[in-house]
Amino acid sequence: MALTAAVKEELSRLEVRKSSVRKAEVSAMLRFAGGLHIISGRIVIEAEVDLAATARRVRVAIAELYGHQSEIIVVSGGGLRRGNRYVVRVVREGEALARQTGLLDSRGRPVRGLPSVVVNGSTADAEAVWRGAFLAHGSLTEPGRSSSMEVTCPGPEAALALVGSARRLGIAAKAREVRGVDRVVIRDGDTIAALLTRMGAHETLLVWEERRMRKEVRATANRLANFDDANLRRSAQAAVAAGARVDRALEILGDDVPEHLKYAGELRVAHKQASLDELGRLADPPMTKDAIAGRIRRLLAMADKRASDLGIPSTEANVTLEMLEE
């Protein structure tokens, strides 16, 4: 599954219980995916999204939070568009919902950015704004030199509001206009990882980080000259770097790490140059390569999330340039 679809699928399944946070997400989603239309003298709200799961999430939230009914219209793909699109439409009480979600102000005028109650909300509200905006019009590319997370915005005011929400989360994002389209862009790999964590896309983060690490190790190996066995060198470097990250992860989590993850981490630290196959054979009872790798990934992800929450250096802080040198 492409990374963008994976993030949206995961976020569409994320359970959020606090009403104010759900409302912030709905407001952002309707603002970034939707529009107000006048049909037969009545205000109609429409929001177009990529996934059926996302459309259902919006529909359920509108019903539970605001008591309004909506319909989902399937738009078949064709031409430049691949796959179906899903339009959530609110016909009855459209104006009431527009006022409740901040699409219209108290005088009935369209709000160009995001409503002040959302902009000035809690940190969890800021996370919800990004979740809603990404579900509406976000994209995530493969990690590498040109990796990026982008959200297409309905206008410059909405883009600046999204940048402000990112800033409140400690995330550096930039608003740009490209060929007349306003976008908010993040290109730094660590920043993308931090925002995926903030939005709640933990499963996709693990996949993204694994691909990122693989590409970084490959790029480092390609830069090494006159080495007879590049694959062996690359594996050894990756193992040493992983050992350093695990060491930091155990330090961050302390006694709060699950026993099975702690055991896998201690194996990695004790045998820093061993391959994953060798670590699996050293385990008692023995484990497969995939099992030991999965536990280490979960340990690192848990520690990086804790570090992000506490505002302290992540596991990457333990990886030094010397580890990648001969």
Curated annotation (Swiss-Prot):
It comes from the Bacteria. GO terms for biological process: cell division; regulation of sporulation. Keywords: Cell cycle, Cell division, DNA-binding. One of its GO terms (molecular function) is DNA binding. Residues 275-308 bind DNA. Pfam families: HTH_WhiA (PF02650), LAGLIDADG_WhiA (PF14527), WhiA_N (PF10298). Involved in cell division and chromosome segregation. Belongs to the WhiA family. This is Probable cell division protein WhiA.
